């Protein structure tokens, strides 16, 4: 159960990293994104596909470019992560109160 959560966190981290580079360096291709991020090209390609399906980036002949939705999402993301972090912390505290931890 928790390994799935850890995998999802890593996936979100990768997608967010790729999106950040697209916003900062657009237009940018897979090879350059791979070099900058340290992720292999096949993982970058997958992240780009996910981001495109979320309408956060769009392809161009020169490489990926961010949509207007991407900048809004990047501003929204830290607050959402803090909210989720608090929920997990509260879950842990509830288990402590019940004597599970």
Which sequence ranges carry the predicted segments?
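Short alpha-helical segments that sit at the start of domains
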Residues: 1-18
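Short, locally clustered residues in the helix-turn-helix/winged-helix DNA-binding domain
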Residues: 20-24
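Short capping segments at the starts of secondary-structure elements
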Residues: 25-29
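A short acidic, leucine-rich amphipathic alpha-helix
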Residues: 32-35
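Short amphipathic alpha-helical interaction segments
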Residues: 38-53
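A short, conserved structural fragment
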Residues: 52-62
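Basic, amphipathic "hinge/linker" alpha-helix immediately C-terminal to the N-terminal HTH DNA-binding motif
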Residues: 62-78
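Amphipathic alpha-helical dimerization/coiled-coil segments
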Residues: 76-101
């Amino acid at each position: 159960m928790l390994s799935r959560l850890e995998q999802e966190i890593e996936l979100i981290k990768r997608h967010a990293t790729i999106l950040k580079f697209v916003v900062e360096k657009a237009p940018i291709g897979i090879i350059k994104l791979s070099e900058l991020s340290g992720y292999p090209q096949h993982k970058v390609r997958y992240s780009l596909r996910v981001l495109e399906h979320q309408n956060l980036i769009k392809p161009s002949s020169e490489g990926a470019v961010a949509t207007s939705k991407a900048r809004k999402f990047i501003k929204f993301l830290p607050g959402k992560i803090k909210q989720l972090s608090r929920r997990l912390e509260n879950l842990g505290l509830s288990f402590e109160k019940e004597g599970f931890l």
